[in-house]
Amino acid sequence: MTTNIHDQRILILDFGSQYTQLIARRVREIGVYCELWAWDVTEEQIREFNPNGIILSGGPESVHAKDSPRAPQYVFDAGVPVFGICYGMQTMAEQLGGAVLGSDMREFGYAQVEVVEQMALLNNIEDHVSPNGNALLDVWMSHGDKVAAVPDGFITAAKTDSCPFAAIVHPEKQFYGVQFHPEVTHTRQGQRMLSHFVLDICQCEKLWTPDAIIEDAVARMKKQIGDDEVILGLSGGVDSSVVAMLLHRAIGKNLTCVFVDNGLLRLNEGQQVMDMFGDHFGLNIIKIDAEERFLSALAGTDEPEAKRKIIGRVFVEVFDEESKKLKNAKWLAQGTIYPDVIESAGSATGKAHVIKSHHNVGGLPDDMAMGLVEPLRELFKDEVRKIGLELGLPYDMLYRHPFPGPGLGVRVLGEVKKEYCDLLRRADAIFIDELHKHDLYNKVSQAFTVFLPVKSVGVMGDARKYDWVVSLRAVETIDFMTAHWAHLPYEFLGKVSNRIINEIDGISRVVYDISGKPPATIEWE
């Protein structure tokens, strides 16, 4: 009998912090299931979820602003421990009768808090010791307002010179609040604080482990699918690859994978996918060579968003045609992951702005009349990778740098042509090859080459040449929300440039992109 890995759970209410998903990932890393919901959740939904504890995230608002978000009153009446982080602490303090002081001065960055009263959340945690013998903690602050008076029953557990209530606790109700962010790595022992809350205070067991997740997913899919057949669009990316391996374990030959080669993939990628999943793992896999169809549809289009939509539309058409040939397939599998679910759910009162449209199979026709199988919809990307390793997928494939859904369609600037894609594929392969050879690949977060639709004069021997330009792009980032351009050695960049120009007829110049994010995005389109 499989363990109920969802039996013990933490609810995280999102007040808009850029770090909120990080809180959820940290709780999962501890080994406990959690879900992330918008702050305006109803009492009925909380009751139904029945959490062992609740975490209130940070957020950009001031509790003094009109219509600023508040925790549902039931959070404080549910009889479970509550942990307020930054804004979460402020709204808890004000809602329970304390006072929050507005401030035009933000405290942002490293700070040192002094523990003045022991509490379970900070038990046996110290980074330094103060002259009077108290524990000092290295933490990360990001706030404007601050608590000025604690509600009845609360005591002060930690302070800084500028923040007298850096950590507070209601010992009887087990309500905790901190003005810093334990979820970020800059708070040196933040993970221990979260672990104290989840394991010691909420008394959850570590049931959420890769092998248990696999066992649970396989059991649920067997129950859902039975003896039916399933079709999966396999791209060779992390998500669809892990879905393929999970389904193969659950239903074996009743899975058919469809791999659409759109002509916008990396060098030899199509053959690598077929070799790995067809020959090595023994999956049923159909390869569709659709390069000409995609490039014909893209001809004459140079606007990035229009290109994305065309690539998505043509994929749906090709996949739909192939699925209709598989008359026994009653289920469609997708690699939806938890951040996709969070993004789709949103807040009942929130607003969102699309910077770039996401490329996935979400737009499949209504008349496909298939059930949906989404075994990864509870998982974050880092969890998907861990599952993939457990299932036998190679590390190099699972931890490869991100590749956009539209592929080279958004790395060839302007109109996409076969000539441009072929040149770009080879140039990019040289860049990645040299990164591996110089042990730099895993030291940057993402690296790729971009084709620029401009020609430049060059000299090769005694001959003048007039050929295309490519740009190398490499960035360092923790969360891909902000990024620095990677300071790769000049000698290395020179070697990559020489190889590209000497080995590829058609490229005369190589440049290096030194733009950060912001203001630039990581991808050029």
Swiss-Prot record:
Pfam families: GATase, GMP_synt_C, NAD_synthase. The active site is at residues 86, 181, 183. GO terms for cellular component: cytosol. Residues 208-400 form the GMPS ATP-PPase domain. Pathway: Purine metabolism; GMP biosynthesis; GMP from XMP (L-Gln route): step 1/1. Residues 9-207 form the Glutamine amidotransferase type-1 domain. Keywords: ATP-binding, Glutamine amidotransferase, GMP biosynthesis, Ligase, Nucleotide-binding, Purine biosynthesis. One of its GO terms (molecular function) is GMP synthase activity. It catalyses: XMP + L-glutamine + ATP + H2O = GMP + L-glutamate + AMP + diphosphate + 2 H(+). Coiled coil: none annotated. The keyword Transport does not apply. InterPro entries: Class_I_gatase-like, GATASE, GMP_synth_C, GMP_synth_GATase, GMP_synthase, GMPS_ATP_PPase_dom, NAD/GMP_synthase, Rossmann-like_a/b/a_fold. ATP binds at residues 235-241. The keyword S-adenosyl-L-methionine does not apply. Signal peptide: none annotated. Homodimer. Catalyzes the synthesis of GMP from XMP. HAMAP family: GMP_synthase. This is GMP synthase [glutamine-hydrolyzing]. The gene is guaA.
